[in-house]
């Protein structure tokens, strides 16, 4: 009986270790923030014209923003900033602008607490600010790229990973309120 119990605990420990190591691997793999099946637009924002800061005061988010370009279906990520997808429109222009970051506490970890009506402020290098209001939030599978589709309004789609082993995306969509 002791031998069976010992083997049970050894197998359980190895299983937990495997899941833990796999979780660390997923957290450190840049491709985890990508949306499977997303095809970027042909137009790309000129370097330096994109936003350089995003603030969601109600969630304690105040981050620098770097420009990101998908290359060979790899979505660049940073451990210290959010990423603006340069193949999407500039935030505030007509269309669906995309900003994403890891779900770490220091990045978009609190985005999962976003509520309809909260303000998102995007700042540009010339100190121009665009204010958006969160219209809805949702959790979608990693392959539901339709959430990133072009739109006819002036929206910004913010997203981060969520779910078991980052298998889903938490999405907050905000609509342009004003130009300040």
Where are these regions (language model features)?
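Solvent-exposed, non-transmembrane regions of membrane-associated and secreted proteins
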Residues: 13-180
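N-terminal Sec-pathway targeting helices
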Residues: 1-13
């Amino acid at each position: 009986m002791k031998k069976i119990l010992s083997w049970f605990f050894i197998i359980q420990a190895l299983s937990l270790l495997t899941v833990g190591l796999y979780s660390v691997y997923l957290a450190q793999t840049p491709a985890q923030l990508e949306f499977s099946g997303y095809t970027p637009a042909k137009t790309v924002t000129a370097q330096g014209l994109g936003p350089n800061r995003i603030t969601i005061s109600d969630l304690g988010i105040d981050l620098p923003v770097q420009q990101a370009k998908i290359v060979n279906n790899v979505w660049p990520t940073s451990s210290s900033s959010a990423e603006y997808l340069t193949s999407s429109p500039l935030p505030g222009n007509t269309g669906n602008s995309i900003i994403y970051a890891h779900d770490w506490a220091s990045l978009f970890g609190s985005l999962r607490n976003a509520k309809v009506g909260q303000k998102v402020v995007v700042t540009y290098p010339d100190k121009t600010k665009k204010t958006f209001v969160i219209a809805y939030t949702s959790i979608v599978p990693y392959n539901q790229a339709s959430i990133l589709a072009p739109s006819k309004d002036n929206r910004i789609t913010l997203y981060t990973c969520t779910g078991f082993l980052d298998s889903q995306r938490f999405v907050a969509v905000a609509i342009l309120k004003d130009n300040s």
